[in-house]
Amino acid sequence: MKLKIYGKRTLKILSLIIAVVLFIGFTQNRFDNNKIRIDGFYLEEKNSLDVVLLGASEVYTDFSSAMAYDEYGFTSYPYAIESNPLALYKSQIKEILNYQTPKLFVIEMNTAANSGEGKDISVVNDVNLRRYTDNMPLSQNKIDTVNEFSGEDDMLSYYLPFIKYHGDPLNFYRCFYETRMNFTGYSLLKGISTKTEKSPGDGAYNLQCDTSTAELMPESEKELREFLDFCKEENLDNVLFVRFPHRVTNDKRYQRFQRGNRVGEIISQYGYDYLNFENSYEAFDLDFNNDFYNDDHMNIYGQQKFTEYFGGILQNNYGIQKSGISSDAKKKWDESVDYTKRLYKYVGSLTESGNDRWIYETSYLLFELDNVEQQ
């Protein structure tokens, strides 16, 4: 009798321990668009990506990997986080190379140009570091990155994010955001994010062919040159630096535009190509009144235009040809194309009706897209 009672108690204790472990496992991270995008990268088949795009929010709002695949047949993915600091790029290149051998790295350089007037976003702070390291699998690269950039007082929380996020009452709800992606085993929308909005571009500057420059902040230039030195030392010849389109509506943004031109001058000193789409936007008929949801990010209309244009450049000028993927991988990419087209139809209807929403690949969004007929 006592043995049976002890057995029941033991079972209850074990059940409680398992429940606590599962709860911590589900809620220890902050679930947002950055986590879902980075987690999606690790779900891609090893060494299957032709192109990896590295950068900040412009990378995942302005370019669609699924639509580039549909149009040109090559595979790609955005390894990008919000406000991604330049100082993390070396670690992120190492991380990408642990899983993929891309034919080309496309590196967006807003982080170097966007620092000015006493503000330097090229350096690392706790928020943007966690957007990256919280979502990395444990590895020597993660340990090295945490050791280099985190403070000693809270270092443990970088390995056990539950310490940081357990007090967020919405985190348990958010933990279901990734259920669908984890069930399918791959990302359907390939990391893109957008808003259902058109933002008028009143007073937007005409910068076509403007090559004027402004100096970078000293720390930004230092970080840029150190990263370029790293690329040369690692014999990374397959790197294309870019400046994705932004809308310039005031003098402060114009100075950032000029710093972007200066970034290009520095990059060219190291023998790398730099494509600046801020002063060549007429080539793909960019509409400042319809193709942006704010000055820094294109909406789905701009995204479709830019993906088609830039994808063609990658294929025609940089030799990124149709990918030789397996039939199983092709089915997955075809499904991504299907769901991205559903997304465009869904987001387009919300945008035209004035229903303002932030859109990224959550389980809830995918369930809504299940009921959308492809456009």
What is each model feature region?
Residues 54, 58-144:
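Membrane-embedded segments
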Residues 123-234, 323-375:
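Secreted/periplasmic serine-hydrolase-like ester/acetyl group-modifying domain
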Residues 8-28:
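Hydrophobic membrane-insertion alpha-helices, especially the h-region
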Residues 104-116, 178-282:
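Conserved, well-ordered alpha-helix/loop/beta-strand core segments that scaffold catalytic motifs
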Residues 63, 88-91, 150, 154, ...:
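Extracytoplasmic/secreted proteins, especially bacterial periplasmic and envelope-associated proteins
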Residues 1-8:
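N-terminal Lys/Arg-rich, disordered targeting/topogenic segments
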Residues 29-49:
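Alpha-helical transmembrane signal-anchor/signal-peptide segments
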Residues 252-365:
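C-terminal regions of proteins
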